[in-house]
Each structure stands twice: as C-alpha cells, then as structure tokens.
C-alpha cells in the first residue's frame, strides 16, 4: 500500500491541484509555495525524505522529521502557516494538508495502535530538539502534570493555553519580513520557541473531515498516570486557542499573511485571495490563538 500511495502523495504535495478556480485555499497555498524558490526547495526536500523513501519500502523517521523541521524553520512563515491552516472541504485536500503538517512517516508509529501519550512525552523530555524551550522557560513543570484543565488556577488558564512550559517567545530578535503595505507579522509568529513539527509530540489533523488535531497517542494504557496523560493530550484536543486559530484561517486569510504573500498589494498578482471577513481578523490578535502550532527556527 505504501509503495502505491507514496508517489501519488508526493505529486499531491508538490503540484497541488491543476486549478484553484473553486476557491480551494489549500491549493492556493500550495501554488504560493511552489512559486517561491526557497519554499519549494525546502518542501521538495522533506517530501523526498518523508514520502519518496517511504514509497521504496522504508521510513527514515529521523531524516523525515529533520527535513520537516528545516522546512518550517527556514521557509517563509506566511507560506508555511498558510499550508498548515488552510481550510479543507474535501478528503483529497484534507489528506494533502495532513501530509504537509506531519507526513505519516514522521507521525504514526510502526505499530497499528498508538502508544500511551506518556511515551512521546517522556521521549520529548529527553530530546534536545523537543525540549528546546526549557532553558528559556526556566524549570520545566511537567506540562502541567497532575493538574487537569478543570482544576488549574485562573491565572494559569489566563495564559496562552498552548504547551505550558514549552511555547514561549524567542529571546532572539525575530527575523524581518519584506516590507509591505500592512502591519508586519507579529514577533511571536515569526520567531517562537516551542514544540516544532517533526518531533515525537507534534500533533496532526486526526481525520479528513474535521479540523481537530491530536498527537499520535492515547491514554488507554497509562495506568496510575492517567490524569497526567489526559492533561497532556488535552493541550491539543481541548485547546480553545488552537481551535480559534484554525477557525480564523477558515474565515479568511489574516492580513499579516496576505501582506507577505502579496507585498506589492496588487490583487491581480496575488496567489491567495481573502474573504470579506479578513478585515475583521485584522483587529484580532492572531497570536493568542497560535500557541501550539507556531514553529521555531531550530537548525
């Protein structure tokens, strides 16, 4: 099955659809990435590692994850975020989006059933890449271990409900984007420290008919640490900020991303179109709803 699907998925990722006349913003995002030399080069690299080699009967998981991290760390942020958050209405589009976020080679494990969420969590605590924000965040408090979302103090709930202790602004100066007619991309979207794509705890869309995300794990075999496991998994599955981020992109492209994609402000040459609701998004803080999926420059 992998041998048959690998080349097809590779073509889907690289070429998108032949036409985006129907308003498919995932296709528009793919075409925008293809038109950008750096985005296309980095995207081709991770597609070759994650899908090309998997089609030959193997899954170089470490290389796939490394290429995926490089794509999101070095690619133009507006283009990479557009690929991640584009809304989908059909299974083909949704599967392309899933494979863009975390290809199967880097997401699911070798077995048919997902492991306990404690396994990737423990692995992440030992991984240099996965715990990249530990130094900036101070002592790591176990991802809110022992505190279910319903029992956390109000002060904790008021903070960005992303990966507590991991998702923090970078201490480094964020990269500057090309000047455009609108406001610049906010600093925390450009240069965050957080859980990157291509790690053991990176979430993905759980199916092709919704915008829900979750890591490849469950809590069925977590024993007496079931509460810890559910609290960790809930950071992805019960995250109102994350849900709001996806809904915001479904309503229309945020202006800060449109400015990056079309710096000349010429609608005739813009690869992405924004709906009339996009102006309303200009008055919202998109960063307050991007805590989990903001991706850092690690390499």
UniProtKB/Swiss-Prot annotation:
SUPFAM superfamilies: GDNF receptor-like. Residues 145-198 are annotated as: Disordered. It comes from the Eukaryota. The keyword Oxidoreductase does not apply. Glycans are attached at residue 208. Predominantly expressed in the adult thyroid gland. Low levels also found in fetal adrenal and thyroid glands. InterPro entries: GDNF/GAS1, GDNF_alpha, GDNF_rcpt. Residues 279-299 form a propeptide. GO terms for cellular component: external side of plasma membrane; extracellular region; plasma membrane; receptor complex. Residues 177-198 have a biased composition (Low complexity). Residues 1-20 form the signal peptide. Keywords: Cell membrane, Glycoprotein, GPI-anchor, Lipoprotein, Membrane, Receptor, Secreted, Signal. A lipid is attached at residue 278 (GPI-anchor amidated glycine). Belongs to the GDNFR family. Receptor for persephin (PSPN), a growth factor that exhibits neurotrophic activity on mesencephalic dopaminergic and motor neurons. Acts by binding to its coreceptor, GFRA4, leading to autophosphorylation and activation of the RET receptor. May be important in C-cell development and, in the postnatal development of the adrenal medulla. PANTHER family: GDNF FAMILY RECEPTOR ALPHA-4 (PTHR10269:SF2), GDNF RECEPTOR ALPHA (PTHR10269). This is GDNF family receptor alpha-4. It comes from Homo sapiens (Human).
């Amino acid at each position: 099955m992998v041998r048959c699907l690998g080349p097809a998925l590779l073509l889907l990722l690289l070429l998108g659809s032949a036409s985006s006349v129907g308003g498919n913003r995932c296709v528009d995002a793919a075409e925008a990435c293809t038109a950008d030399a750096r985005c296309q080069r980095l995207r081709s690299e991770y597609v070759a590692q994650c899908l090309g080699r998997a089609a030959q009967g193997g899954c170089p998981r470490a290389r796939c994850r490394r290429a995926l991290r490089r794509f999101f760390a070095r690619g133009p942020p507006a283009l990479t975020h557009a690929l991640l958050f584009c809304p989908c209405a059909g299974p083909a589009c949704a599967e392309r989006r899933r494979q863009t976020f975390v290809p199967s080679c880097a997401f699911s494990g070798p077995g048919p059933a997902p492991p306990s969420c404690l396994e990737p969590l423990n692995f992440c605590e030992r991984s240099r890449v996965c715990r990249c924000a530990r130094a900036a965040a101070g002592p790591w408090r176990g991802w809110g271990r022992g505190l279910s979302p319903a029992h956390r103090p109000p002060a904790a709930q008021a903070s960005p409900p992303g990966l507590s202790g991991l998702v923090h602004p970078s201490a480094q100066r964020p990269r500057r984007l090309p000047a455009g007619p609108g406001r610049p991309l906010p600093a925390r979207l450009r240069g965050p420290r957080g859980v990157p794509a291509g790690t053991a705890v990176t979430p993905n869309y759980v199916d092709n008919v919704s915008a829900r995300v979750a890591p490849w794990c469950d809590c069925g075999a977590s024993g007496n640490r079931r509460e810890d496991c559910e609290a960790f998994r809930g950071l992805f599955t019960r995250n109102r900020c994350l849900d709001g981020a996806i809904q915001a992109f479904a309503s229309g492209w945020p202006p800060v991303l449109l400015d990056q994609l079309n710096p000349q402000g010429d609608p005739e040459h813009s690869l992405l179109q924004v709906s009339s609701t996009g102006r309303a998004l200009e008055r919202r803080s998109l960063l307050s709803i991007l805590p989990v999926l903001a991706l850092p420059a690690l390499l």
